[in-house]
Amino acid sequence: MRSVSIAGWALFGLAIVAGSGGAQGKPTTLLAAHRGGALLWPENSLLAFRNAVALGADFIEFDVHLSRDGEVMVIHDPTLERTTNGQGAVRDRTVAELKALRLKDRAGVVTGETVPTLDEVIAVASQAGRRMLLEIKLDAGRARYPGIEEKVLALLDRHRMAGSTVVMAFEPATWKRMRELRPDLAVCALYSARMLGRTTLAAELETLRAAGVGFVGLEHTVVDMGALAQARQAGIQVGAWTVNDAAAMKRLIEAGVGVLITDQPDVAKALLGR
């Protein structure tokens, strides 16, 4: 049985034992700007990431796919229609073709923002001294991108940001591959409420603990005091996604969730008293 990796505890800067946190004896909740703050700025844009950093988010959260010529690109969907003025699959376009596109805002209006490369986004976080939640996605056919894990690691190493990054995935094969390539890297297994409807949180936490995974990202509707207690007992930190309702944010902060992942980092910042 593999022990839970301790690589990420310093990264999170969190105490999972009650009594070692703030004045109320609760762990400190960290703030992650989901897609840079998707309800405030064009999602997964350099503008969003720079603004999230300026706002004081602890983490910028984003998603990656591969271009046709093997560049790691920061974009949520495997296809281009929803968030850009382009069409088709990300994997069918070269980096030059993707960079020629423009991102849309949440109202669907085309902006001047381009699709960033992972290299560009890491540079923003590195220069600002911020941490990253990096989700590796599947392609439009629900297949893994060959070699994407190695490419992500190479870019993190180039910028010396591996120690400031949590690599996340819904697909177990992806986070397992990251663990194989870099056992000391902080990785996070993601679960939706629907996924947990086919199993139990306790069973999944035991699987993660045995695999040495120190973080779990849960859809916020399944995160309560019981779930947090189970995770802490397993030595696993919890991030809750994607929390945009102020009452839900407050509930999770009071419960002591490790990371609050939100499209509205401005609202979360106010509730955290920063």
Residue ranges and their predicted role:
Residues 1-2:
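N-terminal secretory signal peptides that target proteins for export/translocation
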Residues 5-9, 15-274:
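Phosphate-group recognition and catalysis centered on beta-loop-alpha active-site segments
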